[in-house]
Amino acid sequence: MRAHPGGGRCCPEQEEGESAAGGSGAGGDSAIEQGGQGSALAPSPVSGVRREGARGGGRGRGRWKQAGRGGGVCGRGRGRGRGRGRGRGRGRGRGRPPSGGSGLGGDGGGCGGGGSGGGGAPRREPVPFPSGSAGPGPRGPRATESGKRMDCPALPPGWKKEEVIRKSGLSAGKSDVYYFSPSGKKFRSKPQLARYLGNTVDLSSFDFRTGKMMPSKLQKNKQRLRNDPLNQNKGKPDLNTTLPIRQTASIFKQPVTKVTNHPSNKVKSDPQRMNEQPRQLFWEKRLQGLSASDVTEQIIKTMELPKGLQGVGPGSNDETLLSAVASALHTSSAPITGQVSAAVEKNPAVWLNTSQPLCKAFIVTDEDIRKQEERVQQVRKKLEEALMADILSRAADTEEMDIEMDSGDEA
C-alpha cells in the first residue's frame, strides 16, 4: 500500500483504467456502495469496487439496488466518466489508483484531487431509502392495528375471536375478523372453520363477522330449501296407477308393460289424509291425573257421565273418557259415535278408530234428550234465583248507604 499525496492511503494491486472517488478515468465494470457519513474507495482487482463518500462522486451508468442496514446503494455498470469532488471516510479495500488520478483507499481518510478522462453517458446516483422503510419494488406490508382476542360463545370453549383494523391503504378503517382455535390455529374464513370443525358444530346460522348464531339465516335456508322445486319432488308417494312412459334416449315415447300377480287390486288414495299433518293420537290421555281448582284452591268435582258411556281399551276410566269426549266435541265437527266395530275388544291395535274417543258405541234416545232438557232447565232456574238474590242484596246495600248519608247531613 502506498500513500496518496493528498493524505489518503491507496491499496495496491489496482489496475489501470480504474478510478477512485474524486478522480476520473476510464472504468470497467464498477459497483458503487454508498455509506452513511463517509466513505473509502477500494476497487477490487477485477470488478473495481468503489465506495463513495458524502460529497464528491463520479459519473457513469449501471444498475443499482438497496443494500443492508446502512441505507447504502450498490450496483454494477460499465462506462466512462469524469468527476471532481472531495470526500472523507474510513473503509477497507484493495486497490491502486490509476495514473494521473487520485482518491482514497484502504482504511484511511483524506482528500482526492481531480483527473481527466473520456466523457460518457452520465450515471444517476440513486437516492437511498431511509432505514426501516419498505424500499423500492412491490408494495410494503399493510399497517394494521391488532385488536383484543375475545371468547366466542357460539363456538366450543377455548375459541377466540380477533378483529384487526386496517390503518393504511385504500381500505383504511375497515376491519378483518380472525378466529383462533384452542391450539392457536388461525382461521380467516367461514369455510375454513366448517372444514376444521366438521359435524361437531352446525355453522349454518353462524355469522362470521359478529361471531353469533343468527336464527334469521337458518330460517332463510329452510325457506330456500322449501321453495326449491327439486326438494319438493322428494318424499311424495306416487299413487298413480297409469302406465309409465319409458325414459330412454329414444325420441319416441314407448309404453312400459306392467306385470302384477294381483291385477284386480286397486290402489286407494285419500287426498284428505295426504294433506293432514302428523299428530299424536289420543293426546288427551296426558291429562290423566290432573284436576282443576277454584280461586280458593278447592278441587272442582268432575261431572258425571251418563251411564250409556263406557270406556274401552286398556287403562280406561271415567276421567280419561271425559277428557276424550270433551276434546272430540271441541276439536272435531264430526258426530261422536264411539268405537262402532265389535272387533275392537279383541284387538284394539288393529280395529281401533282413531277419529273417535275410546268409548263403546252408544245410542242417544228420546228419553236421554228429555232428561238432558230437564237438567238444563233446573240449572237455568238456579242461575236465575242466584242473580235475583244478588240484585236484591245490592239494592238493599245502596238503600242503607243513602239513609246513613241523609242522617249525617241532618246532624
UniProtKB/Swiss-Prot annotation:
Region spans: Disordered: 1-158, 214-241
Assigned GO CC terms: chromatin; cytosol; heterochromatin; nucleoplasm; nucleus; NuRD complex; protein-containing complex
Stretches assigned to the MBD domain: 145-213
Gene3D superfamilies per UniProt: Methyl-cpg-binding Protein 2, Chain A
Compartments where found: Nucleus; Chromosome
Biased composition (Polar residues): 229-241
Broad class of the protein's primary localization: nucleus
SMART domains recorded: MBD
Expression tissues: Highly expressed in brain, heart, kidney, stomach, testis and placenta.
Region of interest (Required for interaction with DHX9 and PRMT5), ranges: 1-149
Modified residues (Phosphoserine): S181, S407
Ranges of compositional bias, category Gly residues: 98-121
Stated role: Binds CpG islands in promoters where the DNA is methylated at position 5 of cytosine within CpG dinucleotides. Binds hemimethylated DNA as well. Recruits histone deacetylases and DNA methyltransferases to chromatin. Acts as a component of the histone deacetylase NuRD complex which participates in the remodeling of chromatin. Acts as a transcriptional repressor and plays a role in gene silencing. Functions as a scaffold protein, targeting GATAD2A and GATAD2B to chromatin to promote repression. May enhance the activation of some unmethylated cAMP-responsive promoters.
Subunit and interaction comment: Heterodimer with MBD3 (via N-terminus). Component of the MeCP1 complex that contains HDAC1 and HDAC2. Component of the nucleosome remodeling and deacetylase (NuRD) repressor complex, composed of core proteins MTA1, MTA2, MTA3, RBBP4, RBBP7, HDAC1, HDAC2, MBD2, MBD3, and peripherally associated proteins CDK2AP1, CDK2AP2, GATAD2A, GATAD2B, CHD3, CHD4 and CHD5. The exact stoichiometry of the NuRD complex is unknown, and some subunits such as MBD2 and MBD3, GATAD2A and GATAD2B, and CHD3, CHD4 and CHD5 define mutually exclusive NuRD complexes. Interacts with CDK2AP1. Interacts with DHX9.
PANTHER family membership: METHYL-CPG BINDING PROTEIN, MBD (PTHR12396), METHYL-CPG-BINDING DOMAIN PROTEIN 2 (PTHR12396:SF5)
Protein name as annotated: Methyl-CpG-binding domain protein 2
Source lineage: Eukaryota, Metazoa, Chordata, Craniata, Vertebrata
Gene it is expressed from: MBD2
